[in-house]
């Protein structure tokens, strides 16, 4: 996916790409690469993920760089309203922790969260809601809820607004 994103934004001088993941500490980690491009994660892919979303099993692992957001951007880089989208397959809380020094500059955070564990060790939606509430973000909307075959809510997109 990184090469596709590079091609997409290659000629846009308003876009700067950093080939790194966001997390609380600077380090190298293994990415569990899924057979489907949209299901890879730093966390191991769980059995429920593979059963609810067939074809998302792990195909291989890759080493990637990870670090806090302030390693790539500073306060001066945020000039207007800031909208942050997080869709990281179970690693949401660690991404938010990696944004800790700059999160007060965000106006909106749009994050995909799960109601059940799909990736080993992931936090669930209620934990993300609590984390952001403590940091003065309120839940402003819930979108795109996916239900499994039995009707159980699996995951949704959550929009948080700074108060």
Question: Regions from the language model: what does each represent?
Answer:
Residues 72-163:
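Conserved acidic-Pro-Pro-aromatic motif
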């Amino acid at each position: 996916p990184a090469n596709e994103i590079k091609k997409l934004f290659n000629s846009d001088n308003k876009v700067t790409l950093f080939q790194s993941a966001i997390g609380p500490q600077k380090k190298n980690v293994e990415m569990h690469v899924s057979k489907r491009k949209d299901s890879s994660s730093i966390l191991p892919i769980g059995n429920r993920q593979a059963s609810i979303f067939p074809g998302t099993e792990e195909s291989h692992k890759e080493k990637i760089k990870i670090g806090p957001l302030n390693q790539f951007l500073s306060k001066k880089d945020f000039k207007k309203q800031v909208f942050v989208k997080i869709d990281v397959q179970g690693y949401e809380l660690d991404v938010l922790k990696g944004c800790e020094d700059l999160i007060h500059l965000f106006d909106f955070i749009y994050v995909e969260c799960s109601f059940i564990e799909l990736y080993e060790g992931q936090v669930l939606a209620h934990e993300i809601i609590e984390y952001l509430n403590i940091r003065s973000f309120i839940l402003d909307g819930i979108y795109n809820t996916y239900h499994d075959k039995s009707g159980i809510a699996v995951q949704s997109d959550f929009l948080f607004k700074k108060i």
